[in-house]
């Protein structure tokens, strides 16, 4: 018993330091601690889903939400119906005629300083459905890799005749903000892009990546709700959750778009759901086993025995 205790209590000076592995904390994880939980949501009108929306944001601890089809109304704007104590609503109700569309950004102002850039630093052409803001983490330091995050929520209706105008706008805004803020600026763009070609956006920087991998609408299957960001390496693979349902007391229908959630990497849970694939094999019958046995017995192995080396 005494021998066992003494062997476990090894004196510090007897430890060979050459055999000690020092585990360094990942800088990527440290930097990701300041990143928001992202959500890309197309509610197909949030007005009959307000309670469900509030519950979802609170339960999932969403910090930065991109809403594509809010269907905002001029006489009842989003900031009058969305009542999340810690969140700021950024929208632009005067960006189109008629019902539908009208993207918005809802962001946690307790964690980030929020500056609305819509039609101030970034001018939005008429008919382009986009809103912009820039976030600054409240504990940012002068040497932080992530100084600011420029955010854009977009909506491009199917077969839109303003696709080129939208792409030109995003390119112009990207260049304006990159020049204005410089080092440490990152981008997140999300929304419902339908049949918009995303390649011109991705070509703006080699660091921009589209990180959503699964269908976001199931009938018919399509990936319509991308998240494009320069922060891809700091995020886990996004999850696609069930569409937002209408409030029980409202006369509404469930959205047909799944909700996309992207969480920053951390030291505890960086694994996506288990992926499986089906592998089909042809069974080897007993008759085949007997034939193989006979072949081994009848085979002359002299050429093998005469080899000087297996190599």
Q: How should each PLM-predicted stretch be described?
A:
Residues 134-149, 231-311:
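Surface polyanion/phosphate-binding segment centered on an Asp-His-Pro turn
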């Amino acid at each position: 018993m005494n021998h066992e205790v003494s062997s476990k209590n090894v004196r510090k000076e007897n430890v060979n330091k050459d055999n000690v592995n020092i585990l360094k904390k990942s800088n990527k994880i440290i930097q990701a601690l300041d990143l928001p939980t992202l959500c890309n949501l197309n509610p197909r009108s949030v007005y009959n889903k307000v309670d469900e929306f509030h519950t979802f944001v609170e339960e999932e601890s969403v910090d930065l939400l991109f809403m594509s089809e809010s269907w905002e109304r001029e006489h009842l704007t989003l900031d009058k119906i969305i009542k999340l104590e810690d969140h700021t609503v950024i929208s632009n109700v005067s960006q189109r005629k008629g019902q539908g569309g009208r993207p918005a950004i809802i962001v946690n102002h307790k964690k980030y300083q929020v500056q609305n850039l819509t039609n101030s630093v970034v001018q939005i052409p008429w008919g382009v459905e986009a809103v912009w803001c820039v976030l600054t983490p409240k504990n940012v330091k002068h040497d932080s890799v992530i100084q600011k995050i420029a955010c854009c929520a977009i909506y491009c209706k199917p077969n839109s005749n303003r696709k080129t105008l939208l792409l030109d706008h995003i390119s112009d805004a990207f260049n304006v903000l990159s020049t204005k803020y410089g080092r440490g600026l990152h981008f997140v763009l999300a929304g419902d892009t339908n049949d918009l070609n995303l390649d011109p956006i991705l070509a703006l920087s080699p660091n921009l990546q589209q990180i959503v991998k699964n269908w976001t609408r199931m009938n018919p299957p399509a990936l319509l709700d991308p998240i494009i960001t320069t922060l891809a390496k700091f995020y886990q693979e996004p999850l696609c959750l069930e569409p937002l349902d209408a409030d029980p007391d409202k006369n509404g229908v469930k959205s047909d778009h799944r909700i996309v959630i992207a969480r920053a990497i951390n030291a505890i849970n960086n694994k996506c759901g288990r992926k499986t694939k089906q592998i089909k094999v042809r069974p080897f019958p007993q008759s085949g086993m007997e034939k193989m046995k006979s072949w081994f017995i009848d085979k002359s192995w002299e050429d093998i025995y005469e080899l000087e080396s297996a190599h």
